[in-house]
Amino acid sequence: MTQASAAPLEKTALESYVALAKPSLIGLSRPELMERLGGIGVAAAQRKMRAQQLWHWIYVRGATDFAQMTSISKELRAQLAEHFTVDRPEVVTEQISNDGTRKWLLRLPSGQAGERAHEVECVYIPETDRGTLCVSSQVGCTLNCSFCHTGTQKLVRNLTAGEIVGQVMVAKDRLGDWPMAVASTQDAGENNRLITNVVMMGMGEPLYNFEAVRDALLIVSDNEGIGLSRRRITLSTSGVVPNIFRTGDEIGVMLAISLHAVRDELRNELVPLNKKYPLKELLQACRDYPGASNARRITFEYVMLKGVNDSLDDAKLLVKLLKGVPAKINLIPFNPWPGSAYQCSDWDQIEKFSEYIFNAGYSSPVRTPRGRDILAACGQLKSETEKLSARERDALRAMAMTD
């Protein structure tokens, strides 16, 4: 029996998505596209070719309407428009930070008349050598991590594969990142991309929505479509142990662990999921992760909380804990949000912590806070349906200016 089949699958109990009256083709696999084409009368002999044409128009050209798909007959385009859409999530607001970070509030189509539409946030972080898109996997979150703003919003539902891929497509739309003039991804070139990396670090726990996240990332990494290398896709989990091996085995992307503490007692408080999957089990799952090596290290994220987890004793325990794991440690200065109970560690303490880890042989970059002024930094995402009061917004601006 393999490790993938030995462990029970971990899923959220909440499954409240309702199918749309006119479903989107975004997020479907090629076999699923062929099945939908068969459902509207496309001959079996033509389905594979037509599905490939749709795949190209949706994921290479970024078509937003069937009318744009000129290599498909008018008759079939009319049939497609009658039964399906290629709609993305609706952009409700776009905020641009002083540092160039962009945050989009996206409204998802409601499943039925009268149902309240749900919203998620998606963030684009431009840097000199890359452009990283931070994507959400759930509306809200169930984990209740005490330092995370998203954790103050209850879990509403999982996103579909189409809604996850749709975030990438919205970002490419807004940034003008589609190679509209080329016929294949080989001609598009990696160097011309604005979105070079995707991180599953937005709202929600990706491994509590495993199947949809898997299906979405396989589409994003498909080399006949969006074509992002799996080495440029990182999935971050708080430690849903049964699905960690599956992530490497079935998706093959880079893994990041939201660690944040080196003792179970403290991690139980910061990341309550630790009560179910304690550090010993989590670290063993990391050692068993398929493909992990010095060339494909696992990233451990560690938020720096003043007087909580930032001592040199914590740094020593961290080095001991990661023995035998090909790892790098990302130190994250705590990003404040209204009502948070924590403060960011002093900068000199962060540097001492980083230096100790580096001298022990681990890469230990300190993440530069991005988008704090628009509540787009790590741990700050939350649907705008959970409205901030004017007082909270003023407090946020003050915190951003102070830091």
From Swiss-Prot:
Spell out the subcellular localization from the entry. Cytoplasm
Detail which positions bind [4Fe-4S] cluster. C141, C145, C148
Its main subcellular localisation, reduced to a broad class, is cytoplasm
Annotated GO CC locations: cytoplasm
Concerning PANTHER family, the annotation shows: 23S RRNA METHYLTRANSFERASE, RADICAL SAM CORE DOMAIN-CONTAINING PROTEIN
Protein purpose: Specifically methylates position 2 of adenine 2503 in 23S rRNA and position 2 of adenine 37 in tRNAs. m2A2503 modification seems to play a crucial role in the proofreading step occurring at the peptidyl transferase center and thus would serve to optimize ribosomal fidelity.
Cofactors per UniProt?
[4Fe-4S] cluster
**Would you say which domain of life the source belongs to?**
Bacteria
Extra information:
Reaction proceeds by a ping-pong mechanism involving intermediate methylation of a conserved cysteine residue.
- Give the first-level EC class, as a single word: transferase
Name listed for the protein in its UniProt record: Dual-specificity RNA methyltransferase RlmN
Q: Which cysteines are joined by disulfide bonds?
A: C134-C378
